[in-house]
């Protein structure tokens, strides 16, 4: 199984709280993969640039990417994005642009999106998601 970690879950994991996130990671099977979207990676880098300790933040991100692979765009992401951006707009229920890209990246891989931002992501009915904070 591929598990794509949303930005909030990555931050929880880096801070080791809530501890249940690390516990869930430790319970994964050997063939399970932890990944993050390039969008999540960009959000982390943006946060590092805005932090008071840039070098420490960048080092923490580098260590994280040794365990969680960063995945980059493909054509399928764009197809899902086009579909869901229009579907949600027509429903009058759009979500944040970065969240939409992350969701579409997970859809393109048939991955389970791990997030605490359930309110936004549950609008995308094709998306598999789990909240590991519960």
From Swiss-Prot:
Result of altering residue 92 to V: Loss of toxicity
Result for mutant: residue 99 to G: Loss of toxicity
Oligomeric form and interacting partners: Forms a complex with VapB1.
First-tier enzyme category under EC: hydrolase
Every PINc domain range: 3-132
Reported impact of residue 103 to T/V: Partial loss of toxicity, still neutralized by VapB1
Cofactor(s) essential for the protein: Mg(2+)
InterPro entries: PIN-like_dom_sf, PIN_dom, Type_II_TA_system_RNase, VapC_family
Variant or mutagenesis effect after changing residue 7 to P: Loss of toxicity
Cited function: Toxic component of a type II toxin-antitoxin (TA) system. Acts as an RNase. Its toxic effect is neutralized by cognate antitoxin VapB1 but not by non-cognate antitoxin VapB2.
Effect of residue 121 to S: Loss of toxicity
EC number: 3.1.-.-
Binding site for Mg(2+): 6, 99
Outcome, altering residue 70 to A: Partial loss of toxicity
Presence of the UniProt keyword Metal-binding in the record: yes
Keywords: Hydrolase, Magnesium, Metal-binding, Nuclease, Toxin-antitoxin system
Effect of residue 117 to I: Loss of toxicity
Record Gene3D superfamilies: 5'-nuclease
Family according to the record: Belongs to the PINc/VapC protein family.
Name assigned to this protein: Ribonuclease VapC1
GO MF assignments: magnesium ion binding; RNA nuclease activity
Top-level taxon in the UniProt lineage: Bacteria
Induction entry: More highly expressed in early growth phase, expression decreases as cell density decreases. Part of the vapB1-vapC1 operon.
Alphabetical list of Pfam families matching this protein: PIN (PF01850)
């Amino acid at each position: 199984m591929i598990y794509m970690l949303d930005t909030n879950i990555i931050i929880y994991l880096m801070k080791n709280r809530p501890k249940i996130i690390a516990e869930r990671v430790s319970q994964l099977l050997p063939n399970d993969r932890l990944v993050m979207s390039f969008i999540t990676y960009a959000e982390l880098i943006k946060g590092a640039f805005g932090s008071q300790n840039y070098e420490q933040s960048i080092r923490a991100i580098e260590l994280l990417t040794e365990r969680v692979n960063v995945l980059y765009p493909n054509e399928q992401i764009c197809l899902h994005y086009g579909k869901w951006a229009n579907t949600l707009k027509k429903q009058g229920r759009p979500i944040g642009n970065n969240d939409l890209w992350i969701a579409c990246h997970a859809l393109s891989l048939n991955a389970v999106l791990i997030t605490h931002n359930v309110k936004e992501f549950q609008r995308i009915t094709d998306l598999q998601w789990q909240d590991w904070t519960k």
